[in-house]
Regions:
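Serine-hydrolase-like catalytic core of hydrolytic proteins
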Residues: 82-265, 313-333, 358, 363-364
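C-terminal domain-tail junction helix/linker
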Residues: 437-446
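A structural signal for well-ordered alpha-helical segments within the folded catalytic domains
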Residues: 20, 96-99, 180-183, 187, ...
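Non-catalytic accessory segments of hydrolases
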Residues: 1-176, 200, 292, 403-413, ...
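Acidic/polar residues in short coil/turn loops that connect beta-strands
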Residues: 8, 181, 199, 300-301
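Short, solvent-exposed turn/loop segments enriched in Gly/Ser/Thr/Pro and often Arg
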Residues: 153-155, 206-210, 369-378, 432-438
Length: 446
């Protein structure tokens, strides 16, 4: 399956070992010029065959690989840089023209109705991209699942709210552009994936950290309709997650006004005319001034979201579908000394509560996991994001000295993830049962 017909035109991919990968498919018009800080617009049809043969630029974000000019870099940042971002082969240029997705499919023809995995990357809503070193679709293709990875606008580019933007919007709102990008990408996949051999009625959205939070947002908005069949939240989505409920409309507008004042722009036209690299520099300076790394977040705006995610779940306003969710042992800086006292990440409790609520509301408890495997090579244990190498099957891309136990766990996790995508169950009942109020079972991944 090297060439596929879509609603926008023909697309040609690259054939690999028994599968085809389509890199850099546009799912929206580039959000540049007058489209900066507007909802994503549909792609115009093209003539001929679009060559989906290379990954595209990442959205504007702080460049953690750049020279820091002598500034002290937090220890955790240097660790994450070594873990994921220091390989030049997987580093990307930055551009506002970044709304692309990638598809790995094992299908040989349209209409095979294979399950679809729709991945949303993490990064605190301010960093990351769709083809990071740890992401790959080969292992999913080998298990009969199509993998889609997407990019979306980040930070200020994806979440700026301001009165100027409210004035030009018919709904008198602004912000949430990154979430709207995710919805546009999901809609594109829903409308086109059957031509790639996928089943549009069996799409599982999943993500880690901000990608998990995004997945929770997508099951909490009416704008995604019936496009989601299942969802997996990894170290992010959960009940009573403050990161999902802390940004109020008033606070978001106030931050937007403060930032725009720092730019010196006197009008929206001036703001949109500013060079992207200059705006990104000002954004990073503003963040340093406020002493907050994550300032620009999705927010309840009355349209994309009418209530926060906790209220959505409590009121039964999330999609009534199968869920799988979990966290890692050392998530959110839980140290070995804390573990000795029995302390777990706040996300752990939130996962249990989520499952109890889905059981209470529609008698369908969720599947909960706890990743406790300590990665070899250093003392970081089961850190935030440690599971990514395993559930993508990309151990060989990592610097760590992985052994037989790691490869066994990798194979197990790929089986759990893809079985859930196929059936709504990660394993047989005797191996992994749902987490119920009367039987709060949690699958240990080690």
């Amino acid at each position: 399956m090297q060439t596929v017909e879509t609603k926008n035109g023909k697309i040609s991919g690259i054939q690999e070992n028994g599968y085809t990968v389509f890199k850099g498919i546009p799912y929206a018009t580039p959000p540049v010029g007058d489209l900066r800080w507007k909802a994503p617009q549909p792609v115009e049809p093209w003539e001929g065959v679009f060559q989906a043969d290379h990954f595209r630029a990442r959205g504007w974000q702080p460049d953690d690989t750049a020279d820091t000019d002598g500034k002290e870099v937090p220890y955790w940042k240097t660790k994450l840089l070594k873990e994921y971002y220091d390989d030049p082969a997987y580093q990307a240029e930055m551009s506002e023209d970044s709304l692309y997705l990638n598809i790995w499919t094992p299908a040989q023809a349209a209409g095979e109705k294979l399950p679809v995995a729709f991945w949303i990357h993490g990064g605190g809503f301010g960093s990351g991209w769709s083809w990071e070193k740890e992401f790959d679709g080969e292992a999913y293709c080998k298990r009969g699942v199509i993998l889609v990875t997407i990019a979306y606008r980040l930070g200020m580019w994806g979440n700026l709210a301001h009165p100027w933007l409210n004035e030009e919007n018919p709904r008198h709102i602004s912000g949430n552009y990154g979430i709207l990008d995710q919805i546009a990408a999901l809609k594109w996949v829903y409308e086109n994936i059957e031509n790639f051999g996928g089943d549009r009625d069996n799409i599982t959205i999943f993500g880690q950290s901000a990608g998990a939070m995004s997945s929770q947002y997508l099951v909490s908005t009416e704008l995604t309709g019936n496009m989601i069949a299942k969802a997996i939240f990894q170290s992010g989505g959960a009940h009573h997650n403050e990161a999902l409920t802390g940004a109020t409309w008033e606070k978001t507008l106030e931050i937007g006004k403060e930032f725009v004042a720092c730019t010196g722009a006197k009008s929206l036209e001036e703001l949109r005319a500013m060079p992207a690299d200059e705006l990104e520099r000002l954004t990073e300076e503003f963040s340093e001034q406020k002493q907050e790394e994550i300032l620009f977040l999705p927010v309840v705006d009355g349209y994309v979201f009418t209530e926060n995610t906790t209220e959505c779940l409590n009121n039964g306003h999330v999609k009534k579908i199968p869920y799988m969710l979990g966290t890692t042992e050392n998530d959110l800086f839980v140290t070995p000394d804390m573990l000795k006292t029995g302390k777990k990440s706040i996300l752990y409790k939130g996962c249990l509560e989520w499952s109890m609520m889905t059981e209470k509301l529609w008698n369908q408890p969720s599947y909960v996991y706890y990743f406790t495997h300590h990665l070899p090579g250093d003392d970081w244990g089961a850190f935030h994001g440690a599971e990514l190498w395993y559930m993508f099957g990309t151990l060989d891309r990592c610097w760590r000295p992985f052994g037989p136990d790691d490869r066994r766990l990798c194979d197990d996790m790929l089986g759990y993830w893809t079985d859930f995508m196929k059936t709504g169950r990660p394993a047989e009942e005797k191996e992994w049962r749902p987490c119920r109020a009367g039987d709060p079972f949690v699958k240990i991944l080690d």
